[in-house]
Swiss-Prot record:
Belongs to the radical SAM superfamily. MoaA family. It catalyses: GTP + AH2 + S-adenosyl-L-methionine = (8S)-3',8-cyclo-7,8-dihydroguanosine 5'-triphosphate + 5'-deoxyadenosine + L-methionine + A + H(+). Pfam families: Fer4_12 (PF13353), Mob_synth_C (PF06463), Radical_SAM (PF04055). This is GTP 3',8-cyclase. The gene is moaA. InterPro entries: Aldolase_TIM, Elp3/MiaA/NifB-like_rSAM, MoaA, MoaA_NifB_PqqE_Fe-S-bd_CS, MoaA_twitch, MoCo_biosynth_MoaA/MoaC, rSAM. It comes from Pseudomonas syringae pv. tomato (strain ATCC BAA-871 / DC3000). S-adenosyl-L-methionine binds at residues 31, 71, 122, 193. GTP binds at residues 18, 67, 98, 159, 263-265. Keywords: 4Fe-4S, GTP-binding, Iron, Iron-sulfur, Lyase, Metal-binding, Molybdenum cofactor biosynthesis, Nucleotide-binding, S-adenosyl-L-methionine. One of its GO terms (biological process) is Mo-molybdopterin cofactor biosynthetic process.
Amino acid sequence: MSEPVLMDRFARKVDYLRMSVTDRCDFRCVYCMAEEMTFLPRQQILSLEEIHQVAERFVALGTRKIRLTGGEPLVRAGVVGLCEKIAALPGLRELCMTTNGSQLDKLAAPLFKAGVTRLNISLDSLDPQRFRELTRTGDLHKVIAGIDAANAAGFVHTKLNCVVMHGRNDHEINDLLAFAIDRNLDVSFIEEMPLGIISEHSRAESFYSSDQVRERIAERYTLIPSTDSTQGPSRYWRLAQAPGIRIGFISPHSHNFCGTCNRVRLTVEGRLLLCLGNEHSVDLKAVLRATPGQPEKLEKAIIDAMQLKPWSHNFTHDDGVQVVRFMNMTGG
């Protein structure tokens, strides 16, 4: 008997779901949200049970990888229990989480026990003052303690996510690599994505391409192309000096990955986003609440939504913004 498969109209298989469990965060990163952010009312967001119901239907339809995101997922009460329920879904191969690391010193071990298979941890600077400037509220030492707690808990192939910005942290690229090598961490260097209008931050001035990142790395290390894949948008390389770790590049501007896109996103409001860089969406919360106890209705809405998935995004790296929602409203 063949496995169920979700397909879009371009015959791309969709088997990766990113789910935002909250729009709230204890950081205010300059590329993610405005400093004075207004968050969604509690009644407007999905309950943990509703998030689990959506995950259950996606896995029944062939999804093999789920990533929980935010905002910061670990500030939502009950998220460890949610992880345990999702990890137990028959057929799911990977349950991952993207986090800023601020809560991992106390939650890494419970997450590992709950069945989370991999962590991505955001880290854009190793300088405490610059880290504070970029996150507006973050404590670098607490994040590093969280990274060490993840290693101690048993997580492997933990990945650092670094958004590289010209004039802000591009000079730290090789220092971040050295930090990753020392702790046996993978790294993804990410081109900034133009989501939401942030008046105090110019994306045109801060854009730094993946090609520029590789040039900077080549000043200290030897990059070797790799065929590794984690079912996500990263294109991976290895380092001759540290072959055990993977170096990824997420390049939505300079080398977009739309042609092989295999993922969709669920916002915490229950909108199923078919593309990070477009507003095509389906309101799954409305389906859940209009037809409780009828999972077949939710499945049909998911299947039908695949036909709305566009071929590609329309990102630019000037200050023009095609998508007005912030990254924390999207699920990073």
